[in-house]
């Protein structure tokens, strides 16, 4: 079949300079779209930015579409069913087709959100998603870096039941891959597997977000899929990366899936935050899934895989789960000791949370971080 050009795609489009993005409203009214074929997957203009829409611009709205399993989407990078690149709003869309990126970033709904803007809400993915790196049920990831001054990315009320995997073992997650922004009330029931491939560093595997950066806020999310990877993996978040000094909060989330690793930083909620510059907190979260690792006897926990992750109030470890090395021994799971500025860690002093990171000391009120 002939490859159908994506709507809003320019042959010279780049992620940093997007031309001719769709800026109107497309209402599918619940109708089903079938027969879309994208099979060009080389590192060229034909192999990039392929989906139903190549790019949705800031004012663009695409909604009420069912993307059937009788579509074929295989492309080089930023691959999705509804959109390759999204700066606008995708709402109430469902995908049943399998999505494949031969290189970077595949999502069941959209490939990547860019330029600090983009919303995906009330969308559902049922297809399997694969990529070389970063395969996710809803969105492959979002653009970050010095050029982005405000992060207004949002994924809300979305579900994934497709299976996720990468060919080099890096970055699979149920909802989003490399991501900066907010994720609220999302659910993953698909199985996540990053154990295959040839990459030396197989990591960043999770039920909701594989790799978070720049003040991610994850609230009210649930994972019930099995999580299989090597290191930096969690039932909710795999790894929190270096970003700004704003706080990253994971709250009111539940993991019911088994989490199985082969190396360091394996946990039921958040695997690792060693490279984060701001406070990473876990509050009112529950882990009911068994957590195991064949390669570590130290950096493994039912809630966290690293002591740099602060455990707030209301966290619950499911009845019958084995006690792991990084499980809390007090209600907050925060050490009540004197501060040693030469060592990183999270402490409780005079009723306040204190985090020492990169030889800097911070006190935290709520989610606000103030350098002393």
Each model region followed by its residue ranges:
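C-terminal outer-membrane/trafficking sorting elements
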Residues: 332-372
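Surface-exposed repetitive/solenoidal architectures
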Residues: 1-334
């Amino acid at each position: 079949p002939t490859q159908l050009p994506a709507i809003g795609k320019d042959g010279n489009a780049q992620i940093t300079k997007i031309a001719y993005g769709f800026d109107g409203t497309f209402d599918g009214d619940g109708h089903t779209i079938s027969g879309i074929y994208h099979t060009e997957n080389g590192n060229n203009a034909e192999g990039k930015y392929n989906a139903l829409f190549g790019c949705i611009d800031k004012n663009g709205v695409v909604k009420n579409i069912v993307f059937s399993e009788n579509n074929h989407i295989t492309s080089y990078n930023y691959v999705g069913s509804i959109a390759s690149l999204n700066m606008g709003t995708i709402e109430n869309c469902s995908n049943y087709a399998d999505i494949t990126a031969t290189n970077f970033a595949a999502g069941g709904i959209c490939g990547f959100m860019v330029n600090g803007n983009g919303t995906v809400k009330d969308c559902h993915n049922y297809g399997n998603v694969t990529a070389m790196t970063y395969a996710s049920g809803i969105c492959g990831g979002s653009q970050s870096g010095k050029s982005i001054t405000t992060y207004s990315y949002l994924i809300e009320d979305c579900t994934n039941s497709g299976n996720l995997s990468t060919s080099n073992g890096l970055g699979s997650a149920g909802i989003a891959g490399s991501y900066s922004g907010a994720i609220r009330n999302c659910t993953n029931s698909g199985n996540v597997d990053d154990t295959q491939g040839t990459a030396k560093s197989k990591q960043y595997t999770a039920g909701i977000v594989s790799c978070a950066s720049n003040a991610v806020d994850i609230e009210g999310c649930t994972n019930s899929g099995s999580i299989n990877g090597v290191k930096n993996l969690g039932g909710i978040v795999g790894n929190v990366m270096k970003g700004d000094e704003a706080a990253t909060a994971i709250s009111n989330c539940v993991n019911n899936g088994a989490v199985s690793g082969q190396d360091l930083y394996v946990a039921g909620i958040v695997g690792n935050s060693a490279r984060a510059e701001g406070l990473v907190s876990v509050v009112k979260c529950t882990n009911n899934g068994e957590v195991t690792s064949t390669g570590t006897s130290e950096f493994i926990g039912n809630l966290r895989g690293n002591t740099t992750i602060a455990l707030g109030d209301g966290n619950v470890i499911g009845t019958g789960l084995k006690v792991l090395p990084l499980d809390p021994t007090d209600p907050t799971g925060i050490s009540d000791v004197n501060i040693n500025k030469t060592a990183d860690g999270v402490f409780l002093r005079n009723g306040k949370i204190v985090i020492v990171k990169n030889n800097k000391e911070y006190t935290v009120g709520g989610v606000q971080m103030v350098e002393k």
